[in-house]
C-alpha cells in the first residue's frame, strides 16, 4: 500500500488499545502490516552486513545527531546523589522533560520542509522510544516505538535521499542501542513488563532478531549460535553484530551463570543449530510475546498518518474502545497475559515490493 505525504493527514497519536479486544484488532490493522512488512525488508537488508563505524547517508547522519544530542543530555542531567532506590533514579524524569522540550527543534533539523507536518506523529514515537518517565523503566514496547520511528522515516523517503544500505540500517540501530544501554545504566531503569529469567531479555528483543539476521545467510559466518556461550567470542564481535552486542551488555549487567540469568538465550545456543533458524524462531516469538501482548502494545498509540487505527483488509476504521471507568470491574490478574496465538503473516499487495514473513518456528525452550 503506497504512502504519499501530500495526501496524508497527520495528527497526534491517541490510545486505542485498552484491553485484549483491542490487542486482537491490532493484529489485523494496517499498522501491523506496515511494521511487519518493513521489518521483513530490514532483516533482508542487514544480512551479511556488519555494524559500521560511520555512515555517508546524509539523513542517517542527521538522525544520529539527534541521538547524540539526547546522549549529551545525560551528561547535563546526572543521577541524583543521596536518592537510593532499587530501580529508577529520579533524575531520569528530568532527562525525559528536557528531551521532550527539545524534540520539536531536533525534528526540524531532520525533516525536509514538505514532511514537517508529520512531526506531530513522529515526536510521539521518538519520545516513547527511551523508556517511561512515570515508571522509570525500559522494555520491548519502547524498542517497538523506535521501530515505528525507523519505519515512519522510511515511509517519508528520508533514508533513501542517498543510497541506503544494510550497514546504514545497522548504524542507526547500533547508535540507538548504545544510547539505551547508557540510559539503563545511568538511571538504573527497571525492566518493563519483564518475564524475569524466563524472558528472552530484560529489555530487548529486536536487537537479537537483527543480529541473528546479520549472520542468517552468511556461509562464512564467524561464529555459530553455540559460540555465544564463549564470552571471548561474544566480545570479539560485539562491535559488529547486534546479537553479540546485546549478549555483551547482558554479561556486563548480570551476575551469576549465563544459564541461570538468561536460560532462554542459553537454550537457543545449545539447541538451535543455525542463525537462520534463530532468526525465524525469534520473529515467531516476537509476534507472540511483544506484538500480541496487551501489556506491551497498550502503550503503542495511533495517529492518522503513519500508523492509523484502520483495518488492513477493508481500509475501515477499527472499533474505538474507551478506557474502562474507575468503577468498572477489573479483569483478574494475569488475564491480559493469556493470549498466545500469533497473527498469520499479512497478505502482501502485488505492488508493495514486500514478500510475506512466512511460517516461522519458535526455538525450543
UniProtKB/Swiss-Prot annotation:
Keywords recorded for this protein, A-Z: Cytoplasm, Isomerase, Nucleus, Rotamase
Regions crossing the membrane: none
Protein name: Serine/threonine-protein phosphatase 2A activator 1
Intrachain S-S bonds: none
Record's compositionally biased regions (Low complexity): 331-342
GO terms under cellular component: chromatin; cytoplasm; nucleus; protein phosphatase type 2A complex
Organism: Eremothecium gossypii (strain ATCC 10895 / CBS 109.51 / FGSC 9923 / NRRL Y-1056) (Yeast)
EC number(s) recorded for this UniProt protein: 5.2.1.8
Source organism superkingdom: Eukaryota
Record-linked PANTHER family: SERINE/THREONINE-PROTEIN PHOSPHATASE 2A REGULATORY SUBUNIT B, SERINE_THREONINE-PROTEIN PHOSPHATASE 2A ACTIVATOR 1
Gene3D superfamilies, per the entry: 1.20.120.1150
Main location: cytoplasm
Function summary: PPIases accelerate the folding of proteins. It catalyzes the cis-trans isomerization of proline imidic peptide bonds in oligopeptides. Acts as a regulatory subunit for PP2A-like phosphatases modulating their activity or substrate specificity, probably by inducing a conformational change in the catalytic subunit, a direct target of the PPIase. Can reactivate inactive phosphatase PP2A-phosphatase methylesterase complexes (PP2Ai) in presence of ATP and Mg(2+) by dissociating the inactive form from the complex.
Keyword Ribonucleoprotein attributed: no
Amino acid at each position: 500500500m503506497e504512502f504519499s505525504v501530500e495526501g496524508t493527514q497527520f495528527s497526534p497519536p491517541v490510545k486505542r488499545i485498552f484491553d485484549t479486544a483491542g490487542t486482537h484488532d491490532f493484529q489485523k490493522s494496517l499498522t501491523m502490516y506496515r511494521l511487519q512488512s518493513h521489518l521483513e525488508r530490514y532483516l533482508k537488508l542487514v544480512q551479511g552486513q556488519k555494524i559500521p563505524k560511520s555512515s555517508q547517508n546524509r539523513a542517517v547522519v542527521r538522525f544520529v545527531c539527534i541521538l547524540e544530542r539526547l546522549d549529551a543530555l545525560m551528561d547535563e542531567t546526572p543521577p541524583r546523589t543521596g536518592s537510593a532506590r532499587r530501580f529508577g533514579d529520579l533524575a531520569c524524569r528530568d532527562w525525559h522533560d528536557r528531551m521532550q522540550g527539545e524534540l520539536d527543534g531536533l525534528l526540524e533539523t531532520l525533516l525536509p520542509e514538505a514532511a514537517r507536518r508529520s512531526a506531530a506523529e513522529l515526536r510521539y514515537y521518538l519520545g516513547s522510544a527511551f523508556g517511561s518517565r512515570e515508571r522509570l523503566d525500559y522494555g520491548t514496547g519502547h524498542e517497538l516505538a523506535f521501530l515505528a520511528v525507523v519505519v515512519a522515516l522510511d515511509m517519508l523517503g528520508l533514508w533513501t535521499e542517498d543510497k541506503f544500505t544494510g550497514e546504514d540500517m545497522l548504524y542507526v540501530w547500533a547508535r540507538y542501542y548504545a544510547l539505551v544501554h547508557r540510559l539503563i545504566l545511568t538511571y538504573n531503569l527497571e525492566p518493563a513488563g519483564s518475564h524475569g529469567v524466563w524472558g528472552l531479555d530484560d529489555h530487548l528483543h529486536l536487537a537479537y532478531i537483527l543480529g541473528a539476521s546479520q549472520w542468517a545467510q552468511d556461509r562464512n559466518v564467524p561464529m555459530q549460535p553455540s559460540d555465544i556461550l564463549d564470552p571471548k567470542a561474544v566480545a570479539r564481535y560485539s562491535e559488529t553484530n547486534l546479537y553479540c552486542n546485546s549478549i555483551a551488555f547482558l554479561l556486563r549487567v548480570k551476575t551469576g551463570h549465563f544459564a541461570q540469568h538468561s536460560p532462554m538465550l542459553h537454550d537457543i545456543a545449545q539447541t538451535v543449530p543455525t542463525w537462520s533458524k534463530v532468526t525465524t524462531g525469534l520473529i515467531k516469538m516476537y509476534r507472540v510475546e511483544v506484538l500480541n501482548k496487551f501489556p506491551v502494545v497498550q502503550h503503542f498509540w495511533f495517529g492518522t498518518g503513519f500508523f492509523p487505527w484502520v483495518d488492513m483488509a477493508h481500509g475501515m476504521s477499527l472499533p474505538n474502545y474507551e478506557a474502562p471507568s474507575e468503577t468498572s470491574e477489573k479483569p483478574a490478574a494475569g488475564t491480559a497475559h493469556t493470549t498466545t496465538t500469533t497473527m498469520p503473516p499479512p497478505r502482501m499487495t502485488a505492488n508493495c515490493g514486500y514478500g510475506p514473513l512466512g511460517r516461522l518456528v519458535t526455538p525450543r525452550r
